[in-house]
Amino acid sequence: MILFLLALIGTLIVMALLTIGRLGFGRSEAFQARKFLRWFIGYFIFNYILGLLILYVSEPALTGPFWGWQWVLWPLFLSSLLNLLGFIRPMMGSLEDISAASQGRRSSSSGRRGIPANTSRGAIAAGIFGLVVAAGVGLLVAGLIVVFTTWFDSNAKALAAIPNISMQKSSDLPQTDPNHIVLVSQDVAAYKGQQILGSNGQNLGSSYNIDPATYTLQSIRQHLYYVAPLQYNNIFINLSNSSTPGFVIVDAENPQAAPELCTDGAHSAHCPTNGASLAYLPGAIFNQDLLRHVYLSGYTYGKLVDPTLELDDNFHPNWSISLMQPTRGYTGDALSEVLLVDAHTGNVVKYTPKSAPTWIDRVMPADTVTQYLQWWGLYHAAPWFNPSGAGQQATASNPQLLYNNIDHPVWLVTMTSASSNDNSSTGVFLFDTHDNKATFYPLAGLGIGDNINQTIASTRANIRNYTVDSTQLYQLYNTPTWVAIFVQKTASGSIYQAVGIVDARNLNGSNVQYETTLSAALQDYQQWLVQQGNNQNGGSTNGSTKTVTGKIERISSVQQGTNTIYYMQIAGQNLIFTANLSLSPKLPLVQPGDNITGTYLSTGSQTVAFQTFDDLTINLSSTPTTPPGGTPTTTPAITPTATSAPKP
């Protein structure tokens, strides 16, 4: 195993330094081969065992300054202390004598203290030399590396330039496909997953659990799901089992869909035919630990970060791991390789970031994206030393996984000014999940932080005071839009109750379109935009504008809040058309049989909203008829005549 070779190399480095200290600086002591050999073998064994332990437990990445071999400073430091024990003991005794004398007490020791006769002065020299090297390299040199790679303006600009950022002139975000909006939060997924854990009659909950933080959003076969692994309840369960039974799948687009528990032998279209059990997990013991398994497989030359459980198109479980290497001293981690680990067999395959399978949703870690954008916000338009904070920006939220395109998600990060009193955005980043590329949209003035949830929760429709569990920023109908999930909190998670949609530029509780289903909320929102005249009367969600002309077959009106909405069926059309009263004053007069014309957006939905509307049957442009060569005639007024009461 590579671990034994690395430990051997580390031990040789430590012993070489200690030997230099003993023989080079302890020359006052006569060289005794047997004594030296006994000392060398003893410390060699000690450092080899200690090196194995450090490598096995901490898995240091062999990259960056000193090629990552600074981990040997710990064995060197401990070995140096052990070599100094013969000197430290009498020194501590002398300090005790001095302390006693200063307090007017007699020392408890008798006689003069000194270094024991059997103490090797060469060992003391080795210990002192080892401590000097450890302190010099671990503190002084490491500190200088940090200073000369991250301090001062040139280094700050270099850090800000690590992400490849393009600036958009338009604030319009890419359009979102409304058919793939996330309606299940991580807490809702955790609640549904907990319910399914004990549903198969195997009492799996007594041995395994699902960490709510491990639910991972991902696209599988053009649909969004949450996936979470079953984990061991305790070390004793781990010791008695070589794998966990499998994983849980929760539909992220449909909160009413039943979750599924995938184990070996499970019969479901959303479960693999075999190999559902997970032999390697983050946090498992010994070689079952995922990162340790990968490290021991030879991937020691980078930082192994962000292990993510992802299912391929056959719903087979795999772990994706990002292998990062620093570009500026100890920092500036850049994605070097993508490792794909079969969660069932442990087979490891490496890819370059651009050649990774397309079904892997993300290989750029969220923490790395945050660090990149923090550097960019601090230094791209401001100097390194900037106590005023002028020109600086900061991330206003953690990266959110956004599926504008179902097959190509991006990290969405809202930016704000560096001022802690600022509650609005300066722009929005969309960061590629497969490459070090980001696009900045100058979408300024959006609400940020807790005020988004609080404002949306204040809508009058939320009469039961449900909690806003999550919000995501989408581009719907050419409008930046917050989509929020209303939930009822429980001890084991959250229960979906409703969805709220609001224009991000007009964040107000009274503007929230609150419905129990997404389709109804989208319909309300589109009508609200039409009424407000926003963004081309409702804009497009990846649809095209079409014109329809035909005869009304059915028409009916409904009241939605303060809006009157007309629903129409037109001959020869397989769609239901809606129109807000604000579109035309003719709408209350429309009857079956009237010929109408209008434009709408074809988005694939069965219900579409008119952007323009006119009833061709109702002609309001006609004028009184004038006889040839004459003047318009008026109709004589009819005056009612009184009648006498009948005689009795």
Regions found by a protein language model. Give the residues of each.
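Soluble extracytoplasmic regions of secretory-pathway and membrane proteins
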Residues: F4-P632, P636, P640, P646-P648
